[in-house]
Amino acid sequence: MTEPGNLQPTFVGFIGTTVDALLLFEACRQNYTHFVDRRPQDRERERLIRSGSVFVFDEVQSGIKRWTDGIAWSPSRVIGNFLVYRQLCKKNSVSDRKRSSKSRSDSDEEEVSAFTVSVPVDVDVASHVNISSPSAPSLSDNLFPGSSFSASSQQNPSSPGSNDIKSEFAAVKNEYVLSPTSPTTSAAFPSSFSSLPLVSSKPTGTPFVPKSPPSSSPSTTNVSNASTSSAPINPRAPQTRRESISSTSSIHYCSSSSLSYLHDTERALVGSLTDSYGFKKSGLIKKTISLMIDGRLHHLISYYTPEDVLNGKLQTPSSFNLFQQLTISKDLLEYKSFRIPPLVEAAESEKISQLSTLEKRTLPSFPYNPFFSSSTAEIDPYHFQGLTLSTSPISGVESSSLSSAISRNQSNLSSFQQQQQFSALQSISNNALNENIEQPPIKMAARHSYPNFLQTLPQYMNDVYNPSGLAFNPVNPNANNSFVNLNLIQFTSPSQALFDYGEGPYVDQKSQYLQPKQPSSNTDSIDQSSYNMSLAASKQFLTSDTQPDVNENYSFISNSIPKNLSTSWNQNMGYHVTNSNSELASQNPLYAQQAVSMESMGNAIQSSAYSAMSTPHGGHYDHYAATAKGKNPLAAENHASGGRLPKVPIPPLSNMRRGSVPIIPSSASLPMRTSGNRFCHYSSLNGNHNRISARTNPYPINNQTMLFTEPLSKERGSLS
């Protein structure tokens, strides 16, 4: 027990949101700061009851049943999970009480109804005492629920009253309480944090008085020193209060009415107590919250003035390193009587902060920020600026003080997810917030060009699309100037698929790629009257037990493949192809290599160079490919031909739709978009055409499972 002269506040600062209060409760539980064990005496009130003082006490341990401070307060108003009171002028408190009493006598029923909706008090959650009936005790005779109440004050629930706090810790009715946080969110907060000692570093009774914030500019301030639970006020740039973000800003917020107070600086500080009573000029605001912890009621009472908060004189607990190391216990986060779950409130506050930060700059309206205008708006100094809530899918970057409790306990992400963080959203935010913000993004337009394929596959793509560990090597020149596609090896053996053909070195590519310098023919034309499809075929691969004669002549398979390509623009692929013989086929063979990953706005993507191609009427030429007899018996040889095949009735697939491009690998189900063409697998065994569609994003990616490797009868020698 502290001596009467040694009573000190638990904390000196500002309690912005519920997470701030929970951090302070947790700090008291772990003895990082202290509970107060008594009320301030009359001679101590002038010293203790001032802006910035925060008192936390255990009702049972301290024996405090009523918190008195000698100040006349207005009726309570609800702000989130808090109750707020505003200091009245003492000379007007009696007349205000009489005036409000008279108005209530005329419309008592309406007043009680409105009060019940905003502050539901007809059920005491803690003690389960019904206080809504006329015979039930009133709230005005005592501070906390569970005690006796008088019927007189129950009829006057919004009366200013005397110095006593009216219904300060009234419990919230069950039907107004939102569901607790989800298990996935709350699991990030363990019940204890073993690395923190449970020993107080300060003597009991000494208040935690935070030092003044550093004088660094806002642009150099470490973002981890900020808090997602409430806005760290910028001490270097005091700003005037905004009337309402939602009314003066062009941003259209989509939030529930229970969180609307976060969008208005005035409401966030004083609630609806604006002009209904005779408030004292530059008077105090009292903000309170009560929780049932370990079966006992704990209360937090804080005092502040709006001017001190807006001018940055008061900082929140979560903006200091001591509290950033604390892990909020699960029982506090999932306290069932919260009107708004703490993390929901914190996320909304941070969203406002981020949008306010972005809106202060002139941003292009499309495509990076379709919801923002180019106007510059005043920044709300109440909310945090430029933070990333660690509960979002993008993780791996140290964010705010709230993330110190969340991200520290998250499971490690795969390298793919970490890369996506930078390649996707961060690319958007960096472009949106760079110094050259006036320059709009370049809009993609139709053009005659070839896809710019990467020469090497990023490591994170190997991790995701190559679970077996085999490397996806691009087509590389070897000693005899042949081009080797090691991607073919994944189907059969680790041997390289090498063979010579006709006009020069050649290696069979994926079915969706057109090979350069193919001999054309007027035979074996394919019906051009139906959908644009690609015919994938495969042949018998020689095995080690059927070694061929190295002197045996090569056998050939003749398949029809399109000679000319359409000039239709494929918006997904971002390139335009015309007349394959003159453009694509005449180019260096490197243009025919496999397509690999191109980073695209956070989604894994899938497509092929062939998806933008269609065959005009009658266009075709033969595709000859030699079997690798004698060269490489174990090599996998896949052949393909493309063209307009007859329409084949097949059962609809779940992801089928008209105008699609090649399927995604069966091992990777990825969200995709499409436009343009269909792709059809052809089974050489049963002759069925399996038309499979998939949605893809704009850039190509490796597709290792495009071809079937069903064996053909060796006697047949060709496709049936």
Swiss-Prot record:
The record's region (Disordered) falls at 146-165, 203-248
* Keywords recorded for this protein, A-Z: Transport
Q: Where is the composition biased (Low complexity)?
A: 146-163, 217-232
Q: Which GO terms describe its biological process?
A: positive regulation of gluconate transmembrane transport; signal transduction
**InterPro entries registered for this protein in UniProt:** Gti1/Pac2
Similarity comment: family membership:
To S.pombe pac2 in the N-terminal region.
This protein's species is Schizosaccharomyces pombe (strain 972 / ATCC 24843)
Q: Name one GO cellular component term.
A: cytosol
Q: Reply yes or no: does the keyword Transport apply.
A: yes
Pfam families attached here? Gti1_Pac2
Coiled-coil positions are none
An example of a GO molecular function for this protein is: DNA binding
**Protein function:** Promotes the onset of gluconate uptake upon glucose starvation.
What's the domain of life for this entry? Eukaryota
Q: Give the protein's recorded name.
A: Gluconate transport inducer 1
